[in-house]
Amino acid sequence: MNVPAALRYTKDHEWIQLLDDGATALVGITDFAQSELGDIVFVELKPAGTALKEHEIFGTVEAVKTVADLFAPVAGEILEVNAGLDSAETVNQDPYGSGWMVKMKLADPASVANLLDAAAYRELIGG
């Protein structure tokens, strides 16, 4: 199972990557999550401009047999949604790259440090 060391993770299986400016980040679902969901057929995300509280639902992922909510790892505002997810299978193929979900402006960039690091996330998923 792929768990990149440079990212932070939630117990709900989202990842977050701080961008170079230190105030914005990309958010997506983990390799473990996409594997557990199976073939993803549709992704619905709240639009750019939406303010989110930590743990607030920012969208859903629909797979062949289930629908899963997406939870904001930290508080902030959605700046951009990934238009490439019109092809939802991108999440299965590249969850940490072209399968990212939203770009966020973080309310408190330091809050990312409170999330799980790669070792703690691996332990959570039993890997």
Curated annotation (Swiss-Prot):
GO CC terms, sorted: cytoplasm; glycine cleavage complex
UniProt GO BP: glycine decarboxylation via glycine cleavage system
PROSITE patterns: BIOTINYL_LIPOYL (PS50968), LIPOYL (PS00189)
Residues that bear N6-lipoyllysine: 65
Cofactors named for this entry: (R)-lipoate
Record keywords: Lipoyl
All copies of domain Lipoyl-binding, residue ranges: 24-105
UniProt xrefs under NCBIfam families: gcvH, PRK01202.1
Role this protein plays: The glycine cleavage system catalyzes the degradation of glycine. The H protein shuttles the methylamine group of glycine from the P protein to the T protein.
Protein family (similarity comment): Belongs to the GcvH family.
Quaternary data: The glycine cleavage system is composed of four proteins: P, T, L and H.
Descriptive protein name: Glycine cleavage system H protein
Protein source organism: Chlorobium luteolum (strain DSM 273 / BCRC 81028 / 2530) (Pelodictyon luteolum)
